[in-house]
UniProtKB/Swiss-Prot annotation:
Disulfide bonds: none annotated. The keyword Transferase applies. The keyword Cell membrane does not apply. (6S)-5,6,7,8-tetrahydrofolate binds at S109, M110, L111, P112. HAMAP family: Formyl_trans. This is Methionyl-tRNA formyltransferase. Belongs to the Fmt family. Attaches a formyl group to the free amino group of methionyl-tRNA(fMet). The formyl group appears to play a dual role in the initiator identity of N-formylmethionyl-tRNA by promoting its recognition by IF2 and preventing the misappropriation of this tRNA by the elongation apparatus. Keywords: Protein biosynthesis, Transferase. It comes from the Bacteria. CDD domains: FMT_core_Met-tRNA-FMT_N (cd08646), Met_tRNA_FMT_C (cd08704).
Length: 307
């Protein structure tokens, strides 16, 4: 089977690698345009651009897929299917219907749950116990297409965004090859609109920790929002990021946000339910610190109430 691959970030890397190693033939790659990344105007290509170039696969970086020139270019490729993995551009109807088997997409959630831009993050933030990777036949909606294959799995305890991201990418890579191997015979299963939800893009407005939530809820937020946009609390008008934490299931009658220091090196904060031990923190413009390093260099008193 001849394949056009469309993808840009690290999430798409395992899929392109698996397709190249398979019996199928990736004949072209479409990815995001190279960007100026720093003050020296150095050009940074996407991870997929770098990989495709290393594999000697032709690479195309259009600003849009809506122009006649780009659509005519794609039409000239003798491809059977287009595989999409976190590409970043809207794929118009003309391209969705262009090839024999259309466009298929790798989506890291248990569709129809968590359609949209941030399914992995929202899965963790909302405390889900299991998730999935789905291969869907793309239509004009946002992740609304019929499901071709779906692989469910349980989330490891305390899993963070980067770990689940990599796990979903690897599962999706194997699954998309299987989908193409059996694309002639696999049924297309419509999604239930009644159970649909949308995983909105993360916002910095969500970053501030609310100590009146449970320790479990806050821990899920910390794990799901690291590295971006991160989570923080305020002390003496300083926004301090929390990069890693641990739930301590001790009951208390303290005001949420109250600081307790155990054994001179453990930083505990009372939440609505239980405590959260802050394991890794970061001051503005500084490197990551363990809790004992933080307590050595930053003055925070027991019984302080954090904002």
């Amino acid at each position: 089977m001849k394949i056009i691959f469309m993808g840009s970030p690290e999430f798409a890397i395992p899929a392109l690698k698996e397709l190249v190693l398979s019996k199928h033939n990736v004949i072209a790659v479409f990815t995001s345009k190279p960007k100026k990344r720093d003050r020296y105007l150095n050009i940074q290509r996407s991870p997929i651009h770098k990989l495709a170039s290393a594999l000697s696969i032709p690479v195309y970086t259009p600003d849009s897929l809506k122009t006649n020139d780009v659509q005519n270019l794609i039409a000239t490729f003798d491809a059977d299917v287009i595989v999409v993995a976190a590409y970043g551009l809207i794929i118009p109807k003309a391209i969705l219907k262009m090839k024999k088997y259309g466009c298929i997409n790798i989506h890291p959630s248990m569709l129809p749950k968590y359609r949209g831009a941030a399914p992995i993050q929202r899965t963790i933030i909302n405390g889900e116990k299991e998730t999935a990777v789905c291969i869907i036949q793309m239509d004009q909606g946002v992740d609304t297409g019929d499901i071709i294959l779906c692989q469910k799995f349980h989330l490891a305890k305390n899993i963070c965004f980067s770990e689940l991201h990599d796990q979903c990418a690897k599962v999706g890579a194997k699954l998309v090859v299987k989908a193409i191997n059996y694309i002639h015979t696999l049924p297309r299963i419509p999604q239930s609109q009644d159970r649909a939800s949308y995983a909105h893009k993360l916002s910095k407005s969500e970053s501030k920790i609310n100590w009146y939530e449970s320790a479990y809820t806050i821990d899920c937020k910390i794990r799901g929002m690291n590295p971006w946009p991160g989570t923080f609390f305020t002390h003496n008008n300083c926004n301090i990021k929390v990069l890693k934490a641990k739930i301590v299931n001790n009951s208390h009658n303290l005001q949420p946000g109250t600081v307790k220091i155990a054994n001179n090196d453990k930083l505990l904060v009372a939440c609505q339910e239980h405590f959260l031990e802050l394991l890794s923190l970061q001051l503005p413009g500084r490197k990551e610190l363990s809790s004992d390093q933080f307590l050595c260099g930053y003055h925070i008193l027991p019984d302080t109430v954090l904002q």
